[in-house]
């Protein structure tokens, strides 16, 4: 029904509940993306360390 919680009103506007729900979903998505980015950064850091170690071994073998 028009004006019910979560329903789109006849004029096309949304109610406060819908806006709040959208904001919470957006926040969840941003937090999830931040966690993924941090995990990727940590993985990259480990890969760089591994690469540095391999380069050191190569340097030692070629001396």
From Swiss-Prot:
Pfam families: IATP. It comes from the Eukaryota. InterPro entries: ATPase_inhibitor_mt. Keywords: Coiled coil, Mitochondrion. Its main location: mitochondrion. It is found in: Mitochondrion. Residues 1-23 are annotated as: Disordered. SUPFAM superfamilies: F1 ATPase inhibitor, IF1, C-terminal domain. One of its GO terms (cellular component) is mitochondrion. Residues 18-62 form a coiled coil. One of its GO terms (molecular function) is ATPase inhibitor activity. This protein forms a one-to-one complex with ATPase to inhibit the enzyme activity completely. Belongs to the ATPase inhibitor family. This is ATPase inhibitor, mitochondrial.
